[in-house]
């Protein structure tokens, strides 16, 4: 397991990262076709250049485990900032450390995610570090978290959810509808691929368009593809929304289950960490994610099956859920919706019922194709 330890007490150092494997994350901001605000550049560089702990005899109260991408680090720092603001003892220098852990999904970039196989491609190594006591809490993008957690861990906290919509980014077109027939769109998401091809069958999708946000924008600027779709939540957290050409509505592109949500896990027997995390939990987000994951669990979805699901609170305070399954080529798309009270019991039932309906409608073999 590859881990790199940083202190998170300082967030203002502009020096280059000491880890050579992270150099891409700073250099990839230099292409001219896309914009990054000065604040964003400073924040990302600071995220990657956090100072080494200066007091060797000081033991961190919390070690945060995370992936090493700029977005993952932004999420880890958001978690750190909220912990520091909520608990005075955590605001002291050296009280919180960030540990970067390289996952299977980070190591294998030459294949589509669906071809790698298995679940937890971006979480397994971090969860193992948590179970082994190498870290105290694990910060995950909830869309990457398998529906079944390791027995030794719990996930008691979801931070407030960001915008769930997808962003369209292109140098030559204002929207998907404006792309000429045969245009190539880059995405590593089967969910996006299937919905794009369902609505715009004349387009071509390159489905091994992988890498962090900066890498994908660089590939786009180099002309590898004509357009790409990225989660708006990630662009907002990186302060890179100036690169967005247009934003797709929920009707045009139903988001991934738990898109835009951050989940924080700890060991199931660590009452202190559970208490810290409970103080950060955003209950409305937690309920929505629970509903969506109940839907996903019922479908037993994997990286090979395009699945989308979104639970939100409507103007009357009710839960409105929309779910979708599709064939990878977009020729078959099945959708459903539910409405009910915004309570844990009802929302879990909504997700489960919606999943069972689509399982029945899809028929045998649909999820194995």
Swiss-Prot record:
Catalytic activity: 4 porphobilinogen + H2O = hydroxymethylbilane + 4 NH4(+)
Cofactor note: Binds 1 dipyrromethane group covalently.
Enzyme Commission number(s) from the entry: 2.5.1.61
A Pfam family recorded for this sequence: Porphobil_deam
Molecular function as annotated in GO: hydroxymethylbilane synthase activity
Entry's Gene Ontology BP terms: chlorophyll biosynthetic process; protoporphyrinogen IX biosynthetic process
Matching Gene3D superfamilies: Periplasmic binding protein-like II, Porphobilinogen deaminase, C-terminal domain
Compartment(s) where it occurs, according to its Swiss-Prot or TrEMBL record: Plastid, Chloroplast
Keyword terms of this UniProt record: Chlorophyll biosynthesis, Chloroplast, Plastid, Porphyrin biosynthesis, Transferase, Transit peptide
Cofactor: dipyrromethane
Keyword Transit peptide tagged: yes
Chief place of localization: plastid
General remark: The porphobilinogen subunits are added to the dipyrromethane group.
Similarity comment text for this entry: Belongs to the HMBS family.
Protein name (record): Porphobilinogen deaminase, chloroplastic
Native source species: Pisum sativum
Organism lineage string: Eukaryota, Viridiplantae, Streptophyta, Embryophyta, Tracheophyta
Gene that specifies this protein: HEMC
